Design a protein with these regions (language model features):
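Short, surface-exposed loop/turn motifs with a glycine/proline- and acidic-biased composition
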Residues: 70, 631-663
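A generic structural motif
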Residues: 325, 384, 632-633, 671
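Edge beta-strands of extracellular beta-sandwich domains
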Residues: 665-670
């Protein structure tokens, strides 16, 4: 009997295994850059490379490359220094936030050492240099030297000298601390180095002699570890089955740092880097690009914009550059002065089905909304959008709703605003201060950062005071009324809390289950249920693989459910359980993975390709119901347990589906091997 079961399983496994494998629900993935080599360390046959604040290793024997990230080996990201200890055979990985990992270079096992990261220290915690001596690492920081036992993985001593130590060394049984500010200090290794009085000044500052690693650099420069060119992802858009990204971070004179203008496009696991050596062509620095917009009809025809005007690319090459001198675009006005082409502010673009490109020209004397059709630019100047002698200074988030109206926001503290533009009538309506909620209470908004339409046609607004939403009926109102979702406390009182009240929302996306993903400036990312009443997930850099709590952009691959998350430390993704729906469920578009389910698999089994709110039943070959529920968008997940909480036995299980109105769909099969 057992033999017959395995023969049947083997036959059916051949049928179901034709479907490709997919990432499991809940999986995290990192897309890290490794282009800028910063430090190199040799460890036997391995060469460890710190590049773009990330880490990879090259094997001299077989020429293989191993990349490392927070997803699979490391405990953090954004590396400041690496250093190898030959005695302990461990690599010290120091992060910019002062966290420390110790990696065994024989098997990649990693020990986290968070003591220094968690320590409360008055002054600069930056590690300026690392010196290896025996099994110890000496870390030079703003107040002295930290002695770290690399073999035991613990901090042995801290020598508080009271001044910044730039580097140190040990020779002739003496330890030397070199400080640009205080000169050179020395103490005998046999002395009590914890006693500040044992250290004496012996001279002025001497710069260190750097080890010649030119040959290693030559070798490393030829390696191709993959990944994007930069870790900057201020703006992202998923379209044409590709992720289009740019670095951005500039809005109306507000920029935390200057970022390269490079456009990076992800297709599957392959990156295409658009031409970025264009300064000699345009005459201006190519940087601070905060919007990329592919032609809706042509994935290889792409527009980009930001601080210095509008750029047009075909097949990754620059074909046109539009500025104030060769087009109707206008430069920004600053304190009554019209600036040059270094400040032609175009923060948002939108390509529509009719072949038009819509352009927002911020802080300009006359311009605000511009239409491009057949390479011709047409101005739709709006006096409503002008204040202080120029247009709104940070117009961004351009989108089209299901009625064909254009919406965008002004992300500036002087005039935070929500704008609706109707192309057919060339009319604009702007909603600005004072804002009130549905109860008439005034909302003190400082920034309105983003706007998205959900599947029920509500328009969600991300602000520094949390998320709000409006309906298109607001166009008939004379007041700027925003709805704040109230979440009942369910504690026996009638009290409720505003949904993410006071949380600074920087970006958002709506998935195919009508759930909202909210990115924040310093609190990670939230997933809120379709009815807005439940917090499904709150991912932070502490409780998950999220790279950083500072979220700059979110984009979703609706076909797979992969949620791309751009942070200030790079790009990662989370495989969610909501995908695009199918109007009809057939054997060609409904399938399950992993399939077969092998004995060592303990994750969720995913059924995808379903219709919206599809009814799903999973039954055994004997007809016994083992699981049932409704889909999230086009996806349903099953943990492999029956209705009584028991793991199901080996066998073939039928997935029966029906639409939300009861019309039966298709049947797919799942093979489970225990």
């Amino acid at each position: 009997m057992r033999k017959k079961i395995w023969i049947l399983l083997s036959f059916l496994i051949l049928q179901v295994a034709t479907f490709q494998s997919s990432a499991a629900i809940g999986d995290w993935k990192a897309y890290m850059a490794y282009s800028e080599v910063q430090e190199i360390e040799e460890a036997g046959n391995w060469i460890f490379v710190q590049a773009s604040s990330n880490l990879y290793a090259y094997n001299r024997n077989d020429q293989s490359i191993q990349t490392f990230s927070k997803m699979d080996f490391l405990n953090d990201c954004d590396i400041q220094h690496i250093a190898y200890n030959k005695t302990a055979k461990r690599l010290l990985i120091l992060y910019n936030n002062a966290n420390i990992d110790l990696m065994n270079t024989q098997n990649w096992s990693v020990q986290n050492l968070p003591d220094y990261y968690a320590a409360t220290i008055t002054g600069d915690k930056t590690i300026n240099d690392i010196y290896m001596y025996g099994k110890f690492a000496y870390l030079c920081y703003g107040l002295g030297i930290i002695k770290l036992n690399m073999a035991d993985g613990e901090i042995s001593d801290t020598y508080t000298l009271g001044f910044k130590v730039n580097w140190c060394e040990i020779r002739d049984n003496q330890i030397y601390a070199y400080s640009k500010e205080e000169g050179t200090y020395r103490a005998a290794l046999s002395d009590n180095l914890l006693d500040r009085n044992r250290w004496s000044k012996v001279g002025t500052y001497t710069a260190p002699k750097k080890e010649d690693k030119s040959e290693l650099m030559k070798l490393v420069s030829s390696l191709l570890p993959g990944g994007p060119k930069y870790n900057h992802f201020w703006y992202m858009k998923f379209i044409h089955n590709q992720l289009y990204t740019c670095g951005g971070a500039f809005l109306s004179g507000i920029s935390l740092d200057t970022r390269p203008g490079t456009i990076q496009v992800l297709n599957q696991d392959n990156w295409t880097i658009y031409q970025d050596d264009i300064r000699n062509t345009t005459g201006y620095q190519y940087q601070d690009i905060n919007c990329v917009e592919p032609d809706i009809h042509d994935p290889n025809h792409v527009f980009a914009s930001g601080r210095t005007g509008l750029y047009e690319f075909t097949d990754g090459k620059l074909t046109h550059y539009y500025n104030k001198d060769n087009s109707i675009l206008e430069a920004a006005v600053d304190r009554g002065t019209v600036l040059d082409n270094n400040y032609v502010l175009v923060h948002s673009l939108l390509s529509d089905e009719s072949g038009k490109l819509w352009i927002l020209n911020s802080q300009a004397t006359h311009r605000s909304i511009i239409e491009m059709k057949d390479n011709q630019l047409i101005a739709h100047d709006q006096k409503t959008l002008n204040a202080n002698g120029y247009s709104l200074s940070a117009m961004t988030g351009l989108m089209k709703d299901r009625q064909g109206r254009l919406w965008f926001v002004n992300d500036n503290h002087e005039t935070p605003a929500i704008v609706c533009y109707q192309p057919e009538t060339d009319e604009v309506k702007m909603f600005s201060k004072p804002f009130t909620n549905q109860d008439g209470a005034e909302i003190n908004l400082y920034y309105i950062r983003c706007i998205k339409e959900d599947l029920k046609h509500n328009l969600w607004i991300g602000t520094d005071q949390g998320p709000f939403y409006i309906t298109p009926h607001i166009l008939d109102d004379t007041q700027s009324t925003l709805t704040q979702v109230k979440v009942p406390r369910n504690d026996g009182t009638n009290y409720a809390d505003y949904l993410l009240g006071g949380v600074d929302i920087t970006c958002m996306a709506v998935d195919q289950a009508n759930r909202k993903w909210f990115g924040t400036s310093n609190n990670g990312i939230y997933l809120i249920s379709a009815d807005n009443m439940e917090q499904i997930h709150h991912f932070t850099a502490t409780n998950s693989k999220l790279l950083s709590n500072n979220i700059e952009s979110i984009a979703i691959n609706d076909a797979t459910g992969e949620v791309f998350i751009g942070t200030n430390k790079g790009l990662c993704s989370y495989m969610s359980d909501a995908t695009a729906t199918n109007e009809e469920m057939t054997q060609d578009n409904v399938w399950a993975y992993p399939n077969p389910v092998k004995p060592d698999y303990t994750g969720l089994i995913t059924i995808t390709g379903l219709s919206l709110d599809a009814d799903v039943k999973i039954v055994s070959t004997s007809g016994t119901l083992v699981n049932q529920g409704r889909s999230n968008g086009g996806t349903y997940t099953w943990n492999g347990y029956d209705l009584k909480g028991r793991r199901v036995a080996s066998g073939i299980y039928m997935v029966e589906t029906a639409t939300s109105n009861g019309e039966k769909g298709t049947v797919c099969k799942i093979a489970i091997i225990r």
